[in-house]
């Protein structure tokens, strides 16, 4: 008769030889040697109840004493290797068991103290998480947040101008007519009509908002308050941009064929050319200054600065556009996707000019894309570092003849800045072509120096550049 111990051993070890031996030993008992599963007087397989009695974990020495005591972490898992179930018996809580098991099974990932600058560490399965103090960030709390406050990183958080300083945190500054608030980043106007603000919109009842009309639509009266109209002998010539009470920026090519300079005027506050509403201010142009490097009939260095005979009076309909600092323009404004261009140019290529001031929202292109496009057209002038492209290549929208000299205005954190001057293009809204604008940032120092200078004799002046 096969002992119960032998049958259990055979079942656990799965040894056919063992079972076979049992079969041989009991052959006389009537079981078939090759079919031990068949029932007989001495069966090999045990009952379910007997099997459950076998599948208990092996007891340690003195197990009968251990079972009388509650689970001990020191005894169960530190003196000897324990299982997840044994750990659960100790902690009596699944979540606490999981937290323990992460560290117990793959080691404590926080043991090397990876979190820097006072950060606290939480162990994870083959990983860890650092909880940083408020002034730090990063995977290991290695980055001091103030080190990220540099001007190339989102303008250092400044509303207007940003300056980096070696060894110290960046500082914010404001344009003339604004002052820095106590937060060190925001700017508030200190004059009634600061540059780059639109009084009509600032004063409008917030309960009745009227968004700016863009996409080649009419600019509502007063919403392009820096727009200037240049005229000679009573005829429309070009557009311009008021940058302070006595100076207007425009395009140099507008003056290539001027003969009677005495009849050149600039009109501010204009909206509808077919009517006079009392908000217009006309001023004779006393002097036109162009770069010495500009060659008439060409496209490079296409910028002009006009000195008015008398300053204009700032009103809700006459406000200058801010002339930004060069670093701010190149580092921040140049990466604003959309800007506004405005003027009374032709509504269609070779079509009639607009009577009401028009405005268009145009996307700025990367210089490389602009260069590639210009190379596809044999007779297209070269795109230089003094220009940039903006607009739509599908021929749907563009600035046009008559818009020349007008502003490319960029909005940033509540203030508008002059970033470009309408210069030239292949036709108007021609498929495959973009509008080309004078890159104002290249001329900031040149413009500022001229505006600080004393008047010089002569109407047309060629000033050294750079």
Curated annotation (Swiss-Prot):
Glycosylation sites: 112, 120, 205, 382
Active site residues according to the UniProt entry: 253, 302, 404
Annotated compartments: Secreted
GO MF annotations, alphabetized: calcium ion binding; serine-type endopeptidase activity
Entries under Gene3D superfamilies matching the protein: Coagulation Factor IX, Laminin, Trypsin-like serine proteases
Organism of this sequence: Pan paniscus
Domain EGF-like stretches: 106-142, 147-188
(3R)-3-hydroxyaspartate carried by residues: 123
Name of the protein in question: Coagulation factor VII
The Peptidase S1 domain, residue ranges: 213-452
GO cellular component terms, semicolon-separated: extracellular space; Golgi lumen
Main location: secreted
Lineage of producing organism: Eukaryota, Metazoa, Chordata, Craniata, Vertebrata
Originating gene: F7
Function: Initiates the extrinsic pathway of blood coagulation. Serine protease that circulates in the blood in a zymogen form. Factor VII is converted to factor VIIa by factor Xa, factor XIIa, factor IXa, or thrombin by minor proteolysis. In the presence of tissue factor and calcium ions, factor VIIa then converts factor X to factor Xa by limited proteolysis. Factor VIIa also converts factor IX to factor IXa in the presence of tissue factor and calcium.
């Amino acid at each position: 008769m096969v002992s119960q111990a032998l049958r259990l051993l055979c079942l656990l070890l799965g040894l056919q030889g063992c079972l076979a031996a049992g079969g041989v030993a009991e052959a006389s008992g009537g079981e078939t040697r090759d079919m031990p599963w068949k029932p007989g007087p001495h069966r090999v397989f045990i009952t379910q109840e007997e099997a459950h009695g076998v599948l208990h974990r092996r007891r340690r020495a003195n197990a009968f004493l251990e079972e009388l005591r509650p689970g001990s972490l020191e005894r169960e898992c530190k003196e000897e290797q324990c299982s997840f179930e044994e750990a659960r018996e100790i902690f009596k809580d699944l979540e606490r068991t999981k937290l323990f098991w992460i560290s117990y099974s793959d080691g404590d990932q926080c043991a090397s103290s990876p979190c820097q600058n006072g950060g606290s560490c939480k162990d994870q399965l083959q990983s860890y998480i650092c909880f940083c103090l408020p002034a730090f960030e990063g995977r290991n709390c290695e980055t001091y947040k103030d080190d990220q406050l540099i001007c190339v990183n989102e303008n250092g958080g400044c509303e207007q101008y940003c300056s980096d300083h070696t060894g110290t945190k960046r500082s914010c500054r404001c344009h003339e007519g604004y002052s820095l608030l106590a937060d060190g980043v925001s700017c508030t106007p200190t004059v009634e009509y600061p540059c780059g603000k639109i009084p009509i919109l600032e004063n409008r009842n917030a309960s009745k908002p009227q968004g700016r009309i863009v996409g080649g639509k009419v600019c509502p009266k007063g919403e392009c308050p820096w727009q200037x109209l240049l005229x000679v002998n009573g005829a429309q010539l070009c557009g311009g941009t008021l940058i302070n009470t006595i100076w207007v920026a425009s395009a140099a090519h507008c003056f290539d064929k001027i003969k009677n300079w005495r009849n050149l005027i600039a009109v501010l506050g204009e909206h509808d050319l077919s009517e006079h509403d009392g908000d217009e201010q006309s001023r004779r142009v006393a002097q036109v200054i162009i770069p010495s490097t500009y060659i008439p009939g060409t496209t490079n260095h296409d910028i002009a600065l006009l000195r008015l005979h008398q300053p204009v009076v700032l009103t809700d309909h006459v406000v200058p556009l801010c002339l930004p600092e060069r670093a701010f323009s190149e580092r921040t404004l140049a990466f604003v996707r959309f800007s506004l261009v405005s003027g009374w140019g032709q509504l269609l290529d070779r079509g009639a000019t607009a009577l009401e001031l028009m405005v268009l929202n145009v996307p700025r292109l990367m210089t490389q894309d602009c260069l590639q496009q210009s190379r596809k057209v044999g007779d297209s002038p070269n795109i230089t570092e003094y220009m940039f492209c903006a607009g739509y290549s599908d021929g749907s929208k563009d600035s046009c003849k008559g818009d020349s000299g007008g502003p490319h205005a960029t909005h940033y954190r509540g203030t508008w800045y002059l970033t470009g001057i309408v210069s030239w293009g292949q036709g108007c809204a021609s498929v495959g072509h973009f509008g080309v604008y004078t890159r104002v940032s290249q001329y900031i120092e040149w413009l500022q120096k001229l505006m600080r200078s004393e008047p010089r004799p002569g109407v047309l002046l060629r000033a050294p550049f750079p």
